[in-house]
Design a protein with these regions (language model features):
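Solvent-exposed, amphipathic alpha-helical segments
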Residues: 18-25, 72, 76, 157-164
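Helix-turn-helix
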Residues: 14, 18-56, 60
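Amphipathic, non-transmembrane alpha-helical scaffold segments
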Residues: 8, 16, 62, 66, ...
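Amphipathic alpha-helical linker/stalk segments
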Residues: 61-89
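Helical hydrophobic small-molecule/effector-binding pocket
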Residues: 79-107, 114-122
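Hydrophobic/aromatic-rich alpha-helical bundle segments in the mid-to-C-terminal region
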Residues: 117-126, 139-200, 211-214
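Amphipathic alpha-helical segments that line or abut small-molecule/effector binding pockets
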Residues: 17, 81-96, 152, 175, ...
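N-terminal intrinsically disordered/low-complexity leader segments
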Residues: 1-10, 191-218
């Protein structure tokens, strides 16, 4: 029996949801199409009715992962009186370190995405840019250039800390890494830019509210 358009769209969304999680858990090359489709509860043969290739899926799944991450964090910071402190604290939490499948895709897949094709890298870049713009509106700085620089430094420091904390096989060293970055940021007086208003912070380009609300925030 021919699958309806609605069911086909649901299946496609299911594949993307599963891919965003499994790629982060196992790596892009660590999960094949057959296993991915099995995890989605679908047949291998149906894959190419939704995507041109695995590379096509990778580009869309990685872009979606960044979108979900970005929207979750923006929502969290929008509802916090100390958004940067909240962001750093939750990002550097042990539960984020230990839950790559639901965590930041840049920390989980950054080095792999760098080796992907132009489509994947471009999609990730375009989905990440609004998050840097958002952060640049709430960090301190006398100029837009300085605030953007600090926003990039903040995010890059957090990503790097999680990467190292996951790589090392010494739990105390892992904890020390997370604590060191948290303390360094605290010592820099990480505070919200007093002149910035949440009304000035750009909203994410693509809100996937229903799906993002189901994504476990880490």
């Amino acid at each position: 029996m021919r699958v309806s358009r609605v069911r086909a769209a649901q299946n496609r969304e299911r594949i993307l949801d599963v891919a965003t999680k499994l790629f982060r858990e196992h790596g892009i090359d660590g999960i094949g199409v057959a296993d991915l489709m099995k995890s989605a509860g679908l047949t291998h043969g149906g894959f190419y009715g939704h995507f041109k290739s695995k590379e096509d899926l990778v580009a869309q799944a990685c872009g979606r992962a960044v979108t979900l991450m970005r929207d979750n964090w923006i929502r969290t910071m929008d509802h916090s009186s100390a958004p940067l402190e909240t962001f750093a604290k939750e990002y550097l939490a042990a539960k984020h370190r230990d839950n790559a499948g639901r965590g930041c895709p840049m920390a989980a897949l950054g080095s792999e995405i760098a080796r992907q094709g132009a489509a994947t890298r471009h999609t990730v870049t375009e989905e990440l840019k609004p998050f840097i713009i958002y952060l640049s509106k709430i960090v301190q700085g006398r100029s837009a250039r300085l605030r953007r620089e600090r926003a990039i430094a903040l995010y890059a420091s957090l990503v790097g800390a999680i990467v190292i904390a996951r790589v090392v096989d010494d739990l105390e060293f892992s904890k020390e890494t997370l604590n060191a970055v948290a303390n360094a940021m605290q010592n820099k007086g990480m505070k919200r830019n007093a002149s910035a208003s949440r009304t000035h912070a750009p909203s994410a380009k693509k809100r996937i509210v229903s799906r993002a609300s189901r994504e476990t925030k880490v």
